[in-house]
Structure formats: C-alpha cells, structure tokens
Amino acid sequence: ELYNRPDCKKELTELEKRIYNYFSSLELPDEPTIYDYLVLSLTHKDVIATFNWDPLLIQAFARCHLFTDNLPHLFCLHGNVAVGYCKEHQEFGLLKAQCPICKKYYPPTKLLYPVDQKNYNDDDYIKGCWDATEAMIEESFMLTIFGYSAPSSDKKAVSLLKRAWGPLEKRQLEETCFIDIIDESEIRKRWEEFIYTHHYQYTNDFFQSYLGMFPRRTCETVFATYMLNVPPRNDMGFHKGMTWNEIEELISDLVHEEETTEDGKNYPLHYTNRGLFS
C-alpha cells in the first residue's frame, strides 16, 4: 500500500492531486436529481452525513436554497472537494466562500482515503463532522442508510455509527430505512446491529422510501402511523421525472407550514386524509 511506503511519497502526492481534480470537475445536470430530492426531503432538524468526496451534494444544497432556507445540516465524514475549512476560527463553508471572521477564503478540506487505518481525529474538520454526526444519531428517531455498503475499509466508521446508535434494546421504537440495490437479506445481515426486530424499511427505489413518499415530514408521518395508528397517504410525495416547477408546487405548502409553525412546536401532519381531523 502506497501509504506505508515512504519511497512512494511523490507518486502518492500526484495520485491524490489527480483524484481531487477529477472529483472537482463533476457537475449536476440542470434537471432535478436524486441529490435534490434528498436535500428537499429534509429540514433543519435532520442531518445528511456523507462519505462522498464529490461536490454533487453540495451543488444540490446550493440550488435547493432557492426554494427554502430550511434545509438539513451536512457533514462530510471523509472530507469533500467543494468544502473549505478555516482551522483558526473553526468555520466551514463552500470552498469559494470566505470565513465570516477573518474574511480569508477557505482552504480546501482534507480528503480521507480508503487506507486500512483511518484516523478520524487527525483533521479538525473531519473530527468535528464525526462528533456532530454521533451526537445527532444518539438523539434520532429515524436512521436512513442510502447506498452505503459498509466496506471492510470502513470498519472503524461503522463502529462509530454503532456506538452512537447504541444497544438495540434501547431502540425498540425507532425505525431504520435502507435504500440500496443490494438484496434485502444481505442488507439485514450487514446492518443487523441497527435493526430492532421488524422496525425497518427496505427499498431499492428512493421514491418508495419514507423520504420520497413523505418529504419534509418523514419522522412525523412514520411516528403517527406506527404510534398513533394514523394512516398516511403515500401518493403525495416526490415521483420520478418531476420538473423544478412541480417540485416547487409540491413543497410550497410544506414550507408555508414550517414558516408559520411556532418555535418548539411540531409541524402539522401533512400526509394524511384531512377528514380524519376535521
């Protein structure tokens, strides 16, 4: 392995440079993508923790701000080519932006490569992302794992996630969702320490997931369904091939509800038959 060979330092530096430049060159198409649906399916009470180096999720965040500022937090657990970090003031943002304190442009974040022994404490930004992610998982009602196969090179990462999720006997009400092309039986095997009995959903289609069917009210809808026996409507969410105008129309009522809900209050149940509560 190159990381364990001092004589390959020059080659390693060149390889990392090419990797960084390649991922930096990627761009989203103009039409809506899964990245956009994912970002808009969540609100400020949610977190997206990603292992991806590419800038596509960051680009989705930037254009989803045109619809609402009520978007999820984003933590890049292996760094990201589109994110910069000011070590002096512990501020981060878009790579082309400036630190709000010193007004200097953000230096790029470090990328964490798939080596045998990853150290998540070496880099301040990555450590901060992990600390925040663990804290959010500890307090979460739902956990969605989207296309992450838990490779052998990420054993430490999975261990950290499990530590945050805690023992299953303390997760008897929570729900775990998996969106993946891997067979369901294999998913159950890989993630058995995150699944309490039957409290999980598996799908290979984002639009059939809780996030896709109940965007921006996922936790509220799942809780009402299983804890309060309130049947949801699953025909009101995102669907394939939507235009930006259709997305704006779909989420406009949701955003209005969010803007008019008092701080500390729950958002109204949205994906239900209104007659049940009239």
Where do the PLM segments sit?
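TIR-domain catalytic/interaction hotspot
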Residues: 119, 123-137
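SIR2/sirtuin-family catalytic core signature
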Residues: 132-278
